[in-house]
Amino acid sequence: VHLTPDEKNAVCALWGKVNVEEVGGEALGRLLVVYPWTQRFFDSFGDLSSPSAVMGNPKVKAHGKKVLSAFSDGLQHLDNLCGTFAKLSELHCDKLHVNPENFRLLGNVLVCVLAHHFGKDFTPEVQAAYEKVVAGVATALAHKYH
């Protein structure tokens, strides 16, 4: 993903303030609530019957943290997202059969959650940089599908 030096600085500065566990759990939870068809990949997570059940589910929170930890690793390798996410792409494509559109949806939800958590600090410029990053990550995760 191509970011200007200012965009890279903005992404990294904000990411340094992100609580990966909290934001990850909220982002994955919102994905499962807003796009309920994505729940089919999480049958083993137990009760996902209502928004409050999803948002309070410890397995959702734990997996959200895992997802955002991987995203965090990707931020260290913005020039090689396909390489960074190659194994996860293969897993989600070949074994889990996740629709690659779901990566884009999760990226959009993550941007919303970051905006909610950071308010005025999540300026339009910061949002634009994050939009580039989540699009790049979604493309990298979908790489094995092509």
Swiss-Prot record:
Modified residues (N6-acetyllysine): K59, K144
Binding site for heme b: H63, H92
Phosphoserine: modified positions: S44
Example GO molecular function: metal ion binding
N-acetylvaline, modified sites: V1
Biological process terms in GO annotation: hydrogen peroxide catabolic process
Pfam families associated with the record: Globin (PF00042)
Expressed in which tissues: Red blood cells.
A Gene Ontology term for the protein's cellular component: haptoglobin-hemoglobin complex
Keywords, in A-Z order: Acetylation, Heme, Iron, Metal-binding, Oxygen transport, Phosphoprotein, S-nitrosylation, Transport
Disulfide bond residue pairs: none
InterPro entries the record matches: Globin, Globin-like_sf, Globin/Proto, Hemoglobin_b, Hemoglobin_oxygen_transport
Residue ranges of domain Globin in the record: 2-146
Modified positions (S-nitrosocysteine) in chain numbering: C93
Subunit structure: Heterotetramer of two alpha chains and two beta chains.
Function: Involved in oxygen transport from the lung to the various peripheral tissues.
PANTHER family: HEMOGLOBIN FAMILY MEMBER, HEMOGLOBIN SUBUNIT BETA
Assigned protein family: Belongs to the globin family.
Protein name: Hemoglobin subunit beta-1/2
Organism: Otolemur crassicaudatus (Brown greater galago)
The organism's taxonomic lineage, starting at the top: Eukaryota, Metazoa, Chordata, Craniata, Vertebrata
Gene designation: HBB
